[in-house]
């Protein structure tokens, strides 16, 4: 195991202030990831309602969904605290620096999950609560414990956990899981590998040092680039398939096609640069993938209002 970076030195036991603890607990929930998950929830609710649903329903669903995601992320940090010490990208996480103790993180993660379940069940509906719990179990049990350290397919299968917000959003409005939600699930499912493999290409040495078999660690760069490209095509196809399933109009189709072409051009660029032996600059695709998903779901939100 490599040594911790100087900036990651654990805090002395007596130097944990209340502010440090609060900030540490918030950091464990990975707020930026929660933001991205919620970007998909509200537009899905708007599509299901064919407009703006009840504001109360939106607020409660978003709050409970954020707590559920925070629970999953906190438990992920608790389980992965050993490898987080090895990776430079994660070396400043609260558990690594002893800002938060493992027992505190575990209790906090479980508490968030319980509160999320009760809020979702009593104030939204129990199908949405079950889906939120399924997302937590899938992310923590299937991905973090079962797949992450064992197979290069970890993010392909485990990434399904990040697709649950669209199912939750749809069921919150309709009380069931409709086919449009399934199609949006497929969009995010296909989006996840290019997004995370681009990140893993950039931090390949980190994952290798932690013995996490991400695809860029165990496969040749050209294999990774081609896989990114194929999943990107699947993502774009799924985004266009929403049109006949959800009865959205030509404006959504045009936006989805333009965004898809933009994304595919970048995926092709990575393949080409790898073939030429150049730096693929994968973080361009990583950041682009966030913009792509955000803009696509803005189009989903506006679809009920557009021709």
Swiss-Prot record:
One of the Pfam families matching this protein, by short name: UbiA
Q: Where in the cell is it found?
A: Cell membrane
Which CDD domains does the UniProt entry name for this protein?
PT_UbiA_Cox10
The alphabetized UniProt keywords are:
Cell membrane, Heme biosynthesis, Membrane, Transferase, Transmembrane, Transmembrane helix
GO MF term set: protoheme IX farnesyltransferase activity
User: Per the record's keyword annotation, is Transferase included, yes or no?
Assistant: yes
- The EC code for this enzyme is 2.5.1.141
Other noteworthy facts? Carbon 2 of the heme B porphyrin ring is defined according to the Fischer nomenclature.
Function, please?
Converts heme B (protoheme IX) to heme O by substitution of the vinyl group on carbon 2 of heme B porphyrin ring with a hydroxyethyl farnesyl side group.
Write down what this protein is called: Protoheme IX farnesyltransferase
């Amino acid at each position: 195991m490599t040594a911790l970076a100087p900036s990651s030195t654990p805090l002395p036991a007596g130097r944990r202030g209340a502010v440090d603890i609060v900030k540490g607990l918030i950091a464990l929930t990975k707020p930026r990831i929660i933001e991205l998950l919620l970007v998909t929830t509200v537009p899905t609710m708007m599509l299901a309602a064919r407009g703006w649903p009840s504001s109360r329903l939106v607020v409660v669903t978003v709050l409970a969904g954020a707590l559920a995601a925070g629970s999953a992320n906190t438990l992920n940090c608790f389980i992965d605290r050993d490898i987080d010490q090895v990776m430079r990208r994660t070396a400043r996480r609260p558990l690594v620096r002893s800002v938060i103790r493992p027992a505190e993180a575990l209790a906090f993660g479980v508490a968030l999950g319980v509160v999320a379940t009760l809020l979702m069940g009593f104030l939204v509906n129990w199908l949405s609560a079950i889906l939120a719990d399924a997302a937590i179990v899938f992310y923590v049990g299937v991905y973090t414990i079962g797949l992450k350290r064992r197979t290069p397919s970890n993010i392909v299968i485990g990434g399904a956990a990040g697709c649950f917000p669209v199912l939750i959003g749809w069921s919150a409005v309709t009380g069931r899981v409709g086919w449009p939600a399934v199609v949006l699930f497929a969009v995010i499912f296909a989006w996840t590998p290019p997004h995370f493999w681009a990140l893993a290409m950039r931090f390949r040495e980190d994952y290798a040092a932690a013995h996490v078999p991400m695809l860029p660690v165990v496969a040749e760069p050209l294999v990774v680039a081609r896989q990114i490209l194929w999943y990107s095509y699947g993502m774009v196809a799924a985004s266009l398939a929403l049109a006949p399933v959800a009865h959205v109009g030509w404006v959504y189709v045009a936006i989805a096609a333009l965004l898809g072409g933009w994304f595919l051009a970048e995926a092709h660029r990575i393949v080409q640069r790898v073939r030429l032996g150049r730096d693929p600059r994968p973080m361009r695709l990583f950041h682009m993938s966030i913009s792509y998903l955000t803009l696509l779901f803005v189009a989903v939100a506006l679809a009920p209002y557009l021709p």
